[in-house]
Amino acid sequence: KEGYIVNYHDGCKYECYKLGDNDYCLRECRSRYGKGAGGYCYAFGCWCTHLYEQAVVWPLPKKTCN
């Protein structure tokens, strides 16, 4: 599974500005989903890869980013 890492509080994606390989996104994806996860900056959001099927990613149901 893949997807944008999401802030559970506000429903927003984790933003990033350095597209492609991005240490911040990799660190955040691994922190949330485990050290087997990958992560990079895609369309100014942190995109996580190699996730388990039940991983919660953006968008959150009934929670819009404000």
UniProtKB/Swiss-Prot annotation:
Residues 1-66 form the LCN-type CS-alpha/beta domain. Disulfide bonds join 12-65, 16-41, 25-46, 29-48. It is found in: Secreted. It comes from the Eukaryota. Expressed by the venom gland. The modification Asparagine amide is found at residue 66. Keywords: Amidation, Disulfide bond, Ion channel impairing toxin, Neurotoxin, Secreted, Toxin, Voltage-gated sodium channel impairing toxin. Is neutralized by the single-chain antibody variable fragment HV. Has the structural arrangement of an alpha-helix connected to antiparallel beta-sheets by disulfide bonds (CS-alpha/beta). GO terms for molecular function: sodium channel inhibitor activity; toxin activity. InterPro entries: LCN-type_CS_alpha_beta_dom (IPR044062), Scorpion_toxin-like (IPR003614), Scorpion_toxin-like_sf (IPR036574), Scorpion_toxinL (IPR018218). This is Beta-toxin Ct71. Beta toxins bind voltage-independently at site-4 of sodium channels (Nav) and shift the voltage of activation toward more negative potentials thereby affecting sodium channel activation and promoting spontaneous and repetitive firing. Lethal to mice. Its main location: secreted. Belongs to the long (4 C-C) scorpion toxin superfamily. Sodium channel inhibitor family. Beta subfamily. GO terms for biological process: defense response. GO terms for cellular component: extracellular region.
